[in-house]
């Protein structure tokens, strides 16, 4: 059946075998057979290209994937012109914000199948699909409260029960579909620690694990040697339904790593430096592949941090080939030893296992970094590529505060640098640069035990010195998996973090995606009263203006231990190399160097507290959760749409659909809706966070009887196309050059010269046919 995930014909006589751990024979489609036929020089192909080639070779059926496609990929060279190729990822991964609309479309296709007289149960994912519910939890209750996690989870279920009932229907009625309940972790960390197989058996053939996902940071899995990246919903749905995605055969930038990180420098610091270098180099729509002697000095979680931030450096992916470090991590994370051995044997036979003797492939271009040159750093205040050395942070902050508004500037007159607002009841003044949000968050860093333990040890050392957080700081700790709290407990660090206010608030994305929760009312009032530029410090991957919190304009990415350090300092207006982070009860200054844990302390703690049993234990019940298990659902081929729902609605895309589609017609007399500058992100195009009642989406909900307190977020309402149409380009910080002097989702309606919302203009143009 065309498009279904079945074994294609062996058109290149490439089927081969290897001896498995058990002594049995394993079969695979051999790339070396192509080399023997003179179609490629395998050692010269980047590993990432080899995986694209394996997919095409295995799926070559002469129809969806042709012999010409295989030969095109096999003949990849650094200088070849880009040509379109098919790629069949072996699975799809979803998070709930973008996954819900994908499942809505599958449900709608089933309805359309009935309308055409067909069997709706034939509409199913044809490849494994995992949806991890991680985007909905919000930090309503901060880390200052010991019961924050349980209370936030309870609120999450109350807000999202309608969505979760829908996903429960999908889990019960769709083939090849699995849902990980709320409170179990962040999709990319769960993928890294549990879902990914690195290689597996499919239709009697061993294949490399590969995937696409409906989240930009799907790229994190490339740190494990699994090729994957984020795609749009339509592409993801195509793969779910057994179709290839089509892409230009990419250029591959080689990134050579040499040396080792110095003591006190974290994987986060290294990653921010790599982001900066690759942004300067230019890698948009390209693969980046890492190699070099320095690779052996990076742990697998270090690599995963680098791979996670591929969207921030602009690449399609940042790929690390599978090597012994990969296998070590598979053992640590509790994978079956026999599977790990078979992975090594298969990938070695396939030419996909990297060793110190592996020849360096040819690359389109190359870049090099000596890891010993990396400095402790942050990135901000508005973009992840704007790295600043920790030693220069105070000077940088003051420059940004007073520079004209832009990618870094805030436009504050130097005469107003000392503006402040008194906070009643706290007996403190809030000033420019004060940090109101400090969040240990995001799979980017919470997947890395070294930096997480460093944060915990720094917290312990700070407590021993008698330090406390400043009263205006809202702290939170949101690990990407429950394994983190297992090793925190084993190391005795849970209590230390909690003492400072870093109680666990949930296992989900939280602050990293803008679900930072509300600031206290007196803090918000103080910000508004003096138009203060206040800050956040988070261990996330993005810090675009308006993303973290609408009141917080200066947002800095940093390692988890630096998040704790800045929470103690309470301000961006500090030189942590030379100024005290705080004072003891005897008014003795405490420097950052006094509480920063040594490498030996971190490594010894790591050795003593992290075990494979923790991963096995925590993932043994990952598909279960008491509230989730109690959600009622029943077997039904068709979803029962609720007419009054403002979360899940039957989309109109398939109305009047025919078995034979109508011919595509050209678009004529279209109008321009937006003209935008640089650094436009998915956040600008389709924001995921909170939204105001006065915009088109808010007004739609108000008209449908939804109270402001129940708005939830844009992301949570992506299962309703009516909300999403009104939310497109509705970011509160977007600047449309067509509607000069405005900020937010505004445009000019050309026939009348009126400034109206982007949604209203689009509807007028559609109605008028112009």
Where are the language model's segments positioned?
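Fe-S-dependent hydro-lyases/dehydratases of central metabolism
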Residues: 2-770
């Amino acid at each position: 059946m065309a498009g279904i995930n079945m074994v294609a014909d062996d058109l290149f006589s490439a089927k081969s075998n290897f001896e498995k751990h058990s002594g049995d024979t394993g079969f695979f489609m051999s790339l070396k057979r192509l080399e023997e036929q003179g179609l490629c020089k395998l050692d010269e192909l980047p590993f990432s290209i080899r995986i694209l080639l394996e997919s095409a070779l295995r799926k070559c059926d002469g129809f969806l994937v042709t012999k010409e496609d295989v030969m095109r990929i096999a003949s990849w060279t650094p200088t070849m012109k880009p040509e379109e190729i098919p790629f069949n990822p072996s699975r799809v991964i979803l998070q709930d914000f973008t996954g819900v609309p994908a499942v809505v479309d599958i449900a709608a296709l089933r309805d359309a199948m009935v309308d055409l007289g067909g069997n709706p149960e034939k509409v199913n994912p044809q490849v494994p699909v995992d949806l991890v519910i991680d985007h909905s939890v919000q930090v309503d209750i901060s880390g200052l409260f010991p019961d924050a996690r349980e209370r936030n989870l309870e609120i999450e279920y109350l807000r999202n029960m309608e969505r979760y009932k829908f996903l429960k229907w999908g889990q019960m009625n769709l083939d090849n579909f699995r849902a990980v309940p709320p409170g179990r972790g962040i999709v990319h960390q769960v993928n890294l620690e549990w879902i990914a197989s690195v290689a597996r058996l499919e239709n009697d053939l061993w294949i490399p694990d590969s995937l696409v996902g409906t989240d930009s940071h799907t790229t994190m899995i490339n740190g494990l040697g699994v090729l994957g990246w984020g795609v749009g919903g339509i592409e993801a749905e195509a793969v779910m339904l057994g179709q290839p995605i089509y892409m230009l055969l990419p250029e591959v930038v080689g990134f050579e790593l040499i040396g080792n990180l110095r003591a006190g420098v974290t994987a986060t610091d290294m990653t921010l430096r790599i982001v900066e270098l690759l942004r300067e180099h230019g890698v948009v729509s390209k693969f980046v592949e890492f190699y070099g002697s320095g690779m052996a000095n990076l742990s697998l979680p270090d690599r995963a941090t680098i791979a996670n931030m591929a969207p921030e450096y602009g690449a399609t992916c940042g790929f690390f080939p599978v090597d012994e470090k990969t296998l070590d991590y598979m053992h640590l994370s509790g994978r079956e030893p026999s599977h790990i051995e078979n992975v090594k044997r298969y990938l070695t036979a396939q030419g996909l296992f990297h060793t110190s003797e592996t020849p360096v492939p040819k690359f389109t271009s190359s870049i090099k970094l000596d890891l010993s040159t990396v400095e402790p750093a942050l990135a901000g205040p508005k973009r992840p590529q704007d790295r600043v050395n920790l030693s220069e942070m105070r000077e940088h902050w003051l420059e940004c505060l007073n520079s004209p508004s832009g990618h870094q500037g805030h436009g504050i007159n130097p005469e107003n640098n000392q503006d402040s607002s008194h906070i009643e009841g706290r007996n403190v003044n809030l000033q420019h640069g004060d940090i109101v949000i400090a969040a240990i968050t995001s799979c980017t860093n919470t997947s890395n035990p070294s930096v997480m333990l460093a944060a915990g040890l720094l917290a312990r050392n700070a407590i021993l010195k008698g330090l406390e957080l400043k009263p205006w700081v809202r702290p939170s700790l949101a690990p990407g998996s429950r394994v983190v709290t297992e090793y925190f407990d084993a190391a005795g660090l849970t209590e230390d973090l909690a003492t400072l206010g870093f109680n666990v608030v949930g296992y989900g994305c939280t602050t990293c995606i803008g679900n930072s929760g509300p600031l206290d009312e007196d803090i918000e009032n103080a910000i508004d009263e003096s138009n203060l530029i206040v800050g956040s410090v988070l261990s996330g991957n993005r810090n675009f203006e308006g993303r973290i919190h609408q009141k917080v304009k200066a947002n800095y990415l940093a390692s988890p231990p630096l998040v704790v350090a800045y929470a103690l300092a309470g301000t961006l207006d500090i030189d942590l190399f030379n100024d005290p982070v705080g004072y003891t009860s005897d008014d003795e200054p405490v420097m950052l160097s006094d509480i920063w844990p040594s490498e030996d302390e971190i490594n010894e703690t790591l050795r003593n507290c992290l075990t494979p049993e923790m991963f096995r234990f925590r993932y043994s019940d990952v598909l279960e959760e008491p509230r989730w298990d109690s959600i009622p659902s029943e077997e039904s081929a068709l979803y029962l749409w609720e007419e009054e729902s403002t979360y899940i609605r039957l989309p109109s895309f398939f109305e009047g659909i025919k078995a034979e589609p109508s011919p595509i017609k050209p678009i004529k007399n279209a109008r321009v809706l937006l003209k935008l500058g640089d650094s436009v992100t998915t956040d600008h195009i389709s924001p995921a966070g909170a939204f105001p009642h006065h915009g088109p989406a808010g007004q739609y909900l108000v008209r449908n009887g939804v109270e402001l307190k129940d708005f939830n977020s844009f992301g949570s309402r992506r299962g309703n196309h009516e909300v999403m149409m009104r939310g497109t380009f509705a970011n509160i910080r977007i600047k449309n050059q067509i509607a000069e002097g405005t900020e937010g989702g505004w445009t000019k309606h050309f026939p009348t010269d009126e400034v109206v919302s982007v949604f209203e203009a689009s509807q007028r143009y559609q109605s008028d046919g112009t």
